[in-house]
Regions:
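Donor-binding and catalytic core of enzymes assembling or modifying cell-surface/extracellular glycoconjugates
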Residues: 29, 33, 108
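Thiamine diphosphate
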Residues: 5-8, 13-25, 92-231
């Protein structure tokens, strides 16, 4: 009987071709069955996760709260959309709040935490899943690590929405510095016009400051042939 636990000890060692072994095992596996105790435990864990991540958005004129962004994404994005997430404070919010319901459709750089990974990942996803939408999520700092790859996305006419969480700083570095040193240094950078940046590559550029504007922009991104950047 399966148990929901973090500690799993092997009972048998299977030596041989992995694909062949799995095929052989699959022939002898019945339809999966989860008993009520396990379902109750899963529901309990789901409730704990929901409670732990139940942060409410605080509204400030002209500035979108991370929860507002994610709630809007959750409302507009379809389940077959591939979402690639760059590294930064937005990455923490996305990991805690955004829900994906298809395997391999929500990509994080957990181990190496590679700044600038989201757009190249999105390009790859758009090439291997040409008939679906891809959304790349990055902070303004991380986006500038690989933003020049918009040229590739435009040249290949890929259906990518590039979403930039713009606060004019490396926020993840900033709050870690403040936690450790009680101050921050070298984390701010000057203003960048990301709409004109996108247009200079031939992509569509949009700017939003409200939840309803983001909803409209995401829908426009779905209806547009080729890459769209939303600042």
């Amino acid at each position: 009987h399966a148990e929901i636990t973090n500690y799993m000890q092997p009972v048998k060692e299977l030596i041989g071709n992995i694909a062949g072994t799995i095929d052989m095992i699959s022939e002898h596996v019945n339809e999966p069955f989860i008993n009520q105790d396990h379902l109750d435990e899963l529901e309990k864990l789901r409730g704990e996760i929901t409670e732990a991540t139940g942060i409410k958005a605080t509204h400030k004129e002209g500035v979108m709260h991370p929860v507002e962004i994610i709630e809007t994404m959750q409302k507009v994005l379809t389940d077959d959309t591939t979402v690639t997430v760059d590294v930064g404070s937005h990455y923490i919010w996305m990991a805690r709040k955004y829900r994906s319901y298809n395997p391999r459709h929500l990509l994080f750089s957990n181990g190496m935490q590679t700044l600038g990974v989201a757009l190249p990942w999105a390009i790859s996803a758009a090439l291997v899943r040409p008939n679906t939408q891809v959304v790349s999520v990055a902070g303004d700092g991380g986006f500038l690590f690989s933003g020049q790859e918009l040229e590739t996305a435009v040249r290949k006419n890929l259906n990518i929405i590039q979403l930039i969480w713009n606060d004019g700083r490396y926020n993840m570095v900033e709050f870690q510095e403040e936690m450790k040193y009680k101050r921050s240094a070298g984390v701010e950078f000057g203003p960048v016009d990301y709409v004109k940046y996108a247009e200079s590559f031939g992509a569509k550029g949009l700017r939003v400051t409200k939840q309803e504007e983001l909803e409209a922009a995401l829908k426009e991104g779905y209806e547009t042939d080729g890459p769209v950047l939303i600042d």
